[in-house]
Amino acid sequence: MNKPVHNKPVHNNEHRRKRFNKKCPFVSAGWKTIDYKDTETLKKFITEKGKILPRRITGVSSRFQGILTLAIKRARHIGFLPFVGED
């Protein structure tokens, strides 16, 4: 049987990213829920185009990501936040 010849290592350490343990800002602050009327807090978790930032970027826990998403959607429907970002 012919075995393939590999000149490169299987795991290339140059392209690995360092992982940082991000703490959920809501858990560390002791929040129980997120209010949809608190637009200043909600704007921190929305991109310039109006998209909700993912957990891997914000560091929000799974529980609070769901609560945060629901609060942002409620604020959008009531009119506190825009659906589309500002140009």
Curated annotation (Swiss-Prot):
Record-linked SUPFAM superfamilies: Ribosomal protein S18
Gene3D superfamilies in UniProt: Ribosomal protein S18 (4.10.640.10)
Residues annotated as signal peptide: none
One Pfam family, short name: Ribosomal_S18
GO MF term (any one): small ribosomal subunit rRNA binding
UniProt GO cellular component terms: cytosolic small ribosomal subunit
Residue ranges of the region described as Disordered: 1-21
Domain of life from the UniProt record: Bacteria
InterPro entries documented for this protein: Ribosomal_bS18, Ribosomal_bS18_CS, Ribosomal_bS18_sf
Any GO BP: translation
Family affiliation: Belongs to the bacterial ribosomal protein bS18 family.
Database matches in NCBIfam families: S18
Function: Binds as a heterodimer with protein bS6 to the central domain of the 16S rRNA, where it helps stabilize the platform of the 30S subunit.
Protein name: Small ribosomal subunit protein bS18
Organism of derivation: Chlamydia abortus (strain DSM 27085 / S26/3)
